[in-house]
């Protein structure tokens, strides 16, 4: 269910990701396979948007006053994966990878001195852990908690697809501003 398309293993170099290597969504299948394949398609899309860029280009921010960058999106989505799959669904107490600074701001979008290779490694390892948690879940009805609220795996997968799709829209614009590359 989580295998990469065309034999490309997960954890492959994000700089080499192409459209042909993205995991294709399941078009006819059960709900779990459909949701997990669409989520993986969105993850692969983020990798594709970052492919072929230099460290400087990955750190390049959108127009002021936004601090948004492709590298910031990768780091943010690592945090989102951690939060929903490990902390909420799996009940772990895993602290942020990119903790708050002295001003109390989350630092995933502060990429001036961030190491892209390390950031991608964190994201890829977090995605692998998320896939393992999903694979181990008995059903989409399994729940986790955040505060007093319960969340099903079904909801979390749908939310993660929405989260990636929204940020991949940002990634489209960022990538086009960097080098003119556009595409799905």
What do these predicted ranges mean?
Residues 2, 9-24, 32-104, 145-184:
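Short, contiguous alpha-helical
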Residues 30-35, 115-117:
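Active-site rim elements
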Residues 105-144, 154-160:
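Acidic/histidine-rich alpha-helical segments that form the ligand environment
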């Amino acid at each position: 269910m989580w295998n990469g398309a065309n034999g490309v293993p997960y954890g492959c170099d994000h700089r080499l990701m192409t459209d042909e290597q993205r995991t294709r969504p399941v078009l006819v299948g059960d709900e779990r396979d459909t949701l997990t394949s669409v989520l993986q398609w969105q993850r692969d899309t983020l990798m594709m948007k970052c492919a072929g860029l230099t460290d400087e280009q990955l750190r390049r921010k959108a127009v002021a006053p936004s601090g948004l960058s492709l590298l910031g999106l990768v780091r943010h989505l690592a945090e989102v994966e951690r939060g929903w799959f490990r902390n909420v669904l799996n009940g772990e107490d895993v602290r942020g990878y990119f903790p708050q600074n002295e001003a109390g701001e989350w630092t995933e979008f502060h990429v001036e001195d961030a190491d892209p290779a390390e950031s991608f490694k964190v994201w890829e390892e977090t995605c692998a852990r998320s896939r393992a948690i999903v694979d181990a879940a008995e059903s989409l009805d399994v729940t986790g908690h955040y505060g007093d609220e319960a969340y099903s795996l079904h909801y979390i997968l749908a939310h993660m697809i929405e989260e990636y799709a929204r940020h991949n829209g940002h990634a489209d614009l960022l990538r086009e501003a960097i080098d003119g590359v556009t595409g799905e």
